[in-house]
């Protein structure tokens, strides 16, 4: 694993964009990087499932969640599948669940936390 710090990267690349500071790290990898692949989701994580079922070596999945904060985009099964297919990490402005399990999966996972599955209807 490469050693790097966010301030050093910002110093070297002045046009870099930094994510929200209130996102939390949940996977066992606190630092991860790779080619970004973006999934835009509203109320279903079906496209996320499609992405993590593909080979992900050297890649990071960025989930742009435009829907309600009352549902999750990532759970333990998706995180496990991403790990099995060698994704470096998952970053989302949406919510995840099963954080107690995800923290033991060797993958980077940065997001908000939520307890409900995406299928929950209100």
Residue ranges with predicted function:
Residues 28-32, 52-56, 83-84, 101-103:
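Solvent-exposed alpha-helices and their adjacent loops that cap or buttress functional pockets
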Residues 35-41:
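Short amphipathic
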Residues 45-51:
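Surface-exposed ligand/attachment interfaces on beta-rich extracellular proteins
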Residues 51-81, 85-93:
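Extracellular/luminal Protease-associated
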Residues 67-68, 95-99, 115:
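Acidic, glycine-rich active-site loops and adjacent beta-strand->loop/helix elements
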Residues 114-122:
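Single conserved hydrophobic/aromatic residue that forms the stacking wall/gate
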């Amino acid at each position: 694993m490469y050693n790097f710090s966010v301030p050093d990267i910002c110093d070297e690349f002045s046009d870099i964009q930094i994510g929200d500071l209130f996102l939390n790290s949940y996977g066992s990898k606190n630092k991860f990087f790779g080619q970004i692949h973006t999934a835009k989701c509203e109320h279903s994580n079906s496209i996320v499932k499609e992405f993590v079922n593909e080979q992900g070596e050297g890649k990071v999945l960025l989930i742009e969640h435009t829907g309600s904060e009352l549902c999750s985009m990532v759970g333990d099964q998706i995180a496990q599948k991403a790990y099995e297919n060698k994704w470096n990490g998952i970053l989302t402005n949406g919510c995840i669940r099963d954080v107690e399990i995800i923290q033991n999966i060797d993958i980077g996972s940065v997001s908000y936390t939520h307890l409900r599955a995406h299928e929950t209807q209100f």
